[in-house]
Amino acid sequence: PMNAFMVWSCGERRKLAQQNPSMQNTQISKQLEYGWKSLTEAEKRTLFQEAQRLKTL
């Protein structure tokens, strides 16, 4: 099952790759790390709730 970071990063990874086609996967992962750390607790809370919902499916 996907955790909250995975739920969020799925769409974000796609966007980053489309916006920066020459960016390597390691660079994308680093950008995702920075982006995740910049999310507010409220933003993360909804992602944790979505991850929990997906676990029950």
Swiss-Prot record:
Record text on subunit structure and interactions: Interacts with CALM, EP300, HDAC3, KPNB1, ZNF208 isoform KRAB-O, PARP1, SLC9A3R2 and WT1. The interaction with EP300 modulates its DNA-binding activity. The interaction with KPNB1 is sensitive to dissociation by Ran in the GTP-bound form. Interaction with PARP1 impaired its DNA-binding activity.
PANTHER family recorded: SEX-DETERMINING REGION Y PROTEIN (PTHR10270:SF161), SOX TRANSCRIPTION FACTOR (PTHR10270)
Listed name of the protein: Sex-determining region Y protein
Similarity annotation: Belongs to the SRY family.
Organism whose genome encodes this protein: Apodemus flavicollis (Yellow-necked field mouse)
Keywords from the UniProt entry: Activator, Calmodulin-binding, Cytoplasm, Differentiation, DNA-binding, Nucleus, Sexual differentiation, Transcription, Transcription regulation
Pfam families per record: HMG_box
Keyword Cytoplasm among UniProt keywords: yes
Keyword Transmembrane tagged: no
Lineage of source species: Eukaryota, Metazoa, Chordata, Craniata, Vertebrata
Broad class of the protein's primary localization: nucleus
Subcellular location as annotated: Nucleus speckle; Cytoplasm; Nucleus
GO biological process: cell differentiation; sex differentiation
Portion annotated as DNA-binding: 1-57
Purpose: Transcriptional regulator that controls a genetic switch in male development. It is necessary and sufficient for initiating male sex determination by directing the development of supporting cell precursors (pre-Sertoli cells) as Sertoli rather than granulosa cells. Involved in different aspects of gene regulation including promoter activation or repression. Binds to the DNA consensus sequence 5'-[AT]AACAA[AT]-3'. SRY HMG box recognizes DNA by partial intercalation in the minor groove and promotes DNA bending. Also involved in pre-mRNA splicing.
SUPFAM superfamilies referenced in this protein's UniProt entry, alphabetically: HMG-box (SSF47095)
Molecular-function GO term, any one: RNA polymerase II cis-regulatory region sequence-specific DNA binding
One cellular component term from this protein's GO annotations in UniProt: nucleus
